Amino acid sequence: RKKIRIRAYPNTSDKNFYLEIKNSSVEGRFKTRKILNKKMVNFYEKAGIFDNQYGTCLPNFYVIYEREYSMIGDVRISIDKNLVYKNYRTDTFYNDTSLIVEIKTSIKKNLDDLIKLFPFQRIRFSKYCFAVDNLSQ
C-alpha cells in the first residue's frame, strides 16, 4: 500500500509544505518526506505527481483538521477534531464531528500494557478512504 500526499500544518509555527510518500509492505512501513515551496505545491496541484507505480497522481481530496498532541510516558497520543473532507474537483464537502485518536509508541512497547492504559476499541481508519466513501461522485 502506498500513500502520496502533500501536507501542511497551518496552525503551527511550521509554515512548510511537505510531499510525503508512505509505503506499507511485509517488510515494514517506510516514509519519505520532502519540503516543498508554494510554487511546487501549485505545480503539483495542476500537473500531478508522477509515481513509478501509479503514474501521474492528481489531487482528489482535501482533508483539513485540528490536531492536538499529548505524551504519556513513551506513548504519543494525537487527537484530530473539526475534520472537513472536501472533494477537490466538485468542491462538495463533509463536516465530521468525530474525534480520531491515534496512539504511537515504540515497537518494543508491550501490547497488553497499551490495552490496559487505553481500553478503547481498536479500529483501522483512513481519512482518505472516509473521503472517498462520503464524497465520491
PLM regions with names:
Residues 1-137:
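Phosphate-end processing signature that detects enzymes handling 5′-triphosphorylated RNA
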